UniProtKB/Swiss-Prot annotation:
GO cellular component: cytoplasm
Disulfide pattern: none
Gene: hutI
NCBIfam families per UniProt: hutI
Binding site for N-formimidoyl-L-glutamate: Y153, N328, G330
Protein name (database record): Imidazolonepropionase
Bound cofactor: record note: Binds 1 zinc or iron ion per subunit.
UniProt cross-references to Gene3D superfamilies, sorted A to Z: Metal-dependent hydrolases, Urease, subunit C, domain 1
Alphabetized SUPFAM superfamilies for the sequence: Composite domain of metallo-dependent hydrolases (SSF51338), Metallo-dependent hydrolases (SSF51556)
Pfam families linked to this entry: Amidohydro_1 (PF01979)
EC number: 3.5.2.7
Binding residues annotated for 4-imidazolone-5-propanoate, in chain numbering: R90, Y153, H186, E254, S331
Amino acid sequence: MTADLLLTHFNQVFCPKDLGHPLFGEEMKEAQVLEDGYIAVKDGKILAVGSGEPDASLVGPDTKIQSYEGKIATPGLIDCHTHLVYGGSREHEFAKKLAGVPYLEILAQGGGILSTVRATREASFDTLYDKSRRLLDYMLLHGVTTVEAKSGYGLDWETEKRQLDVVGALDRDHEIDLVSTFMAAHAVPPEYKGRSQEYLELIVEEMLPRVKAENLAEFCDIFCEKGVFTADESRYLLSKAKEMGFKLRIHADEIESIGGVDVAAELGATSAEHLMVATDEGIRKMAEAKVIGNLLPATTFSLMEDTYAPARKMLEAGMAITLTTDSNPGSCPTANLQFVMQLGCFMMRLTPVEVLNAVTINAAYSVNRQDKIGSFDTGKQADITILDAKNIDYPLYFFATNLTHQVYKAGKLVVDQGRIV
């Protein structure tokens, strides 16, 4: 079969292994790295990958051939935890952060999430759409081709739905594919202060059924943290969401360990997020339950904390992990996944292969798109990130610089040398 598109002579092509499950523990050390590699694309899907000169059968009279000496290729990068859609910004809290005021104290003062809730409730659909689209453009320019996006800055039905509607519209309109997560349980809204269980009952009885009926989200998430929602409250919401057919996520062990990882393991959550203060016992439970750890080192960096998620312990225990931005206006105002990948090396001591597996094949499993993206297996969508680097180590070693040369989405060139095509 001849290719429509043949990308040749890469210095290296990074090929994650899709073993039919996320890469656990030692498996994350493994990948195929093709020297002088090529990628053949047919009808927007991967036809073949290999080293050296492509087989003559791949080349026809209409095959477009492009050479990439001095470049590397990876599957399109996947940002599997973001809070993409929100109103306003929170630079006015920055001085407090620099002065050492804890995040939970800022939240208790009506800042943090609640500040963004007010701004998001006031924002129109068009305002949220335009702002989120600009963020997606930035992500695309940095090699990202799929993004998970949460609601959670409305905390009422009208605004939560508006956020999810924006995600749906951008999924249709933008080159990046989006995966939607419903997270009305991101905080207790001011009007329910002191009545968190009552608010969760509102979510369960009124919001979740409408989200499911209107097919607005695939996942349900909750913030299990001291001063927000307890482990029992998280178990209540997520068990109800599971009964309705949602896949589960949980923000857990970010600031204090209060049992969120136990809930993740008990309910078979797809992923647990943050895990900066995860305990050895919690790690063991998540490994046994095959819960993916979505790790967010840029959040630790932004909060000016010293405690990064214990990624090496997780791998030694046999967990699967990803790296992702947590892009949001407060605790992690960035949309640069390449920087997060570099933090994974510098601050978590992950290897380049482990990092690249984390943002490709494991991230694909985290967003339930493993059959479509995350590796260069034949038949998967031809999402390809091409970096201006001589080997796979270089973009992790040479930090704080966007090395994206080109991006292909489903076989279509969408980024070329710093601009969206």
